[in-house]
């Protein structure tokens, strides 16, 4: 189950990176050579920042999973005493020959 959580965390990080990449399209459009060059430079800097962010996201370790001791403590905390019915107030009379066949 831990592997599934790790996989879901990684998929979330990849979705975030994909969204960031899609919001930073390659520059297109008319303009002078210097304008196009500056747009490409800006995009390159933005791309490098995105790569740095991706490295930080992947480098951050996931929070540690619960140790067996923590799980045992949580299990004990969830335990409750069940409501038991009240004991009978009057005891039935016992016969000495109860359960014996009469002869």
Swiss-Prot record:
A GO BP annotation: mRNA transport
Signal sequence residues: none
Keyword Cell inner membrane: no
Gene3D superfamilies, per database record: 6.10.140.630
Entries under Pfam families matching the protein: REV (PF00424)
Ranges of biased composition (kind: Polar residues): 21-35, 92-103
Residue span of region Homomultimerization: 16-24
Region annotated Disordered, chain positions: 19-42, 80-103
Name used for this protein in its record: Protein Rev
Species per Swiss-Prot/TrEMBL record: Human immunodeficiency virus type 2 subtype A (isolate BEN)
UniProt gene name: rev
